[in-house]
Amino acid sequence: MTSDDVSAIEVTDGVRSLHLEWDDPGIAVLGMIQLTRDELVERIRTGELPLPPLAKLLNIEVVDAAPGRMTLRLTPDERHVNFLGVVGGGVVGAVLDVAMWGAVQLSVQDKSMLTTVSMTSNLVRGVSHTQRALEAVAEAVHVGRTTATAESRLVDAAGKVYATATATFVRMGGGNG
């Protein structure tokens, strides 16, 4: 997915609108079940396997993916703003969560899927909707038979940290790793 996939925000009489389109999320689930880990990594990295609809809504795209790590790009805009006029902490948390999930999911050799059961995030500085793209860089810390953990950080192009997070994931069927 690229930022070209998301239509520009349109303004008519001061009202903003955004048209979104996404692929059937079942395609990605089916791909995860049918592909080897290496095939899954490659198809996510190239954009051949669609990200979930949440990625379109939040304007997230894959920068890089490999077993044990994932980097996503968030391009903030007005859709992300809270009542204080800055990008909401929930948006930041969601991007970090998706990146950490990718890092641990791409680490498993079997067909099990992982889901987040606990996440802690720390917002270090505010994110403006007018700033340039930020990257959520995540790494798997532990991938075991039943649980996995990961850590991530949201950084700008200069490496300045905006947020950090850690998460625990649990396996849901498919094997014992």
Which residues are covered by each model-predicted region?
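Terminal targeting signals and extreme-terminal segments of soluble enzymes
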Residues: 1-177
